[in-house]
Regions:
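N-terminal loops that bind phosphate or other acidic moieties
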Residues: 1-348
């Protein structure tokens, strides 16, 4: 796997940043989480005047072999249908990107459909979906490396345009299944506590999903008695998920603000942090969604989401919805007057 050189944020400016925030014309701490966000963005950028230049959103698409086991209520073809819909501007992700000024890149990493001639989709297809991890590894080590490379390449394209804040999303029917398994493995949490309804499974559907994933885990443990850190990632992950991990790590390496979306992207963030713990410094965990286990996964990392809106769409939509709060935090530290300039008595 590619090596990333990700340093912890430089905290030498922390005292100066805090002093600037505390001297804004407001009671100390009165803007709550906005002050915390302003501190984090300032530390990431090593600046007393942070900015959110050229926000970009990467949406990676891929299909999953495990879908063949009936673990999702949505049929496989919804992945490619939605990918095409995104090119027409008709998805939830399109609306929020337009609303908040994000440049959207739609990337086919492993959709089980030929999208090579579809205008608006970047073709980086590694294979037409992963293998079925109920019986074997979802991808080879070479395919894993390719997916990481795709994520890095797409992040680099954004960076070349001056991007300072990167949001990452996904489209892939059945990708809650590998996310649930990663949560169980990485958090040492019973699998049953990690499985939810996904796109809308009923109780019998959830039970079937549990049985399939439980057998897949048993098979994995027998096939991989001495796993490396990347073994569970390539064994269960989707191409779109591994590409997302690559993009997150590359963005952290280059000191970008990285917005983490819902259950699937949080699972990818957990995976990225397991490989490079310092990557967490660059991540803002934007919301806690409605998918079973999302809150617990956030708690595993000590992450404090900004919003609780009951979202479970994916695509990066929750992270995009949160962006105005992050923008407000940056505007606060840059545009709000301080006590001296406003000629207001500092009363603390």
């Amino acid at each position: 796997m590619k090596h990333f050189d990700i340093h912890s944020v430089n905290r030498s400016l922390e005292t100066a940043i805090q002093a600037k925030i505390d001297n804004l014309n407001k009671p100390k701490g009165a803007l709550g989480r906005l002050e915390e966000i302003a501190m984090q963005v300032s530390l990431i950028q090593e600046s007393l005047t942070p900015s959110l230049a050229h926000p970009c959103h990467l949406l990676f698409g891929g299909d999953h072999g495990i879908e063949r086991e009936g673990v999702s209520v949505s049929p496989r073809e919804v992945t490619w249908q939605q990918m095409i819909n995104f090119t027409h501007g008709g998805g939830g992700v399109n609306m929020f990107c337009r609303q908040h000024g994000f440049k959207l890149r739609i990337v086919d990493v492993g959709v089980d459909y030929d999208l090579s001639d579809v205008e608006g989709i970047i073709d980086r297809k590694i294979a037409r979906g992963t293998k079925n991890f109920r019986y074997e590894a979802a991808m080879s080590e070479q395919e894993f490396d390719q997916a990481i490379h795709v994520g890095c390449e797409m992040a680099d394209d954004c960076i070349a345009e001056g991007c300072g804040v990167l949001c990452v999303g996904e489209m892939g029917i059945a990708n809650t299944s590998p996310s649930s398994i990663w949560m169980s493995l990485f958090g040492n949490i019973p699998l049953a506590d990690c499985i939810g309804a996904g796109a809308g499974l009923d109780k019998p559907g959830i039970q079937h999903k549990y049985e399939v994933l439980s057998k897949a885990l048993d098979n994995y443990r027998s096939q991989e008695p001495q796993p490396t850190p990347i073994t569970p990632l390539r064994y269960f992950g989707g191409f779109e998920m591994i590409a997302a991990i690559g993009a997150m790590l590359r963005a952290a390496e280059q000191h970008l603000v990285v917005l983490i979306d819902g259950f699937i992207m949080t699972a990818c963030a957990v995976a990225a942090i397991r490989l490079y713990p310092t990557a967490k410094d660059y991540m803002i965990f934007t919301h806690c969604g409605d998918e079973s286990g999302h809150k617990r996964m956030l708690d595993m990392m000590g992450a404090k989401p900004l919003l609780h809106l009951g979202l479970r769409l994916g695509e990066g939509t929750g992270a995009l919805c949160t962006y105005p709060l992050i923008d407000s935090a940056v505007r606060m530290i840059n545009e709000m007057n301080n006590f001296d300039n406003a000629r207001i008595t500092k009363y603390f």
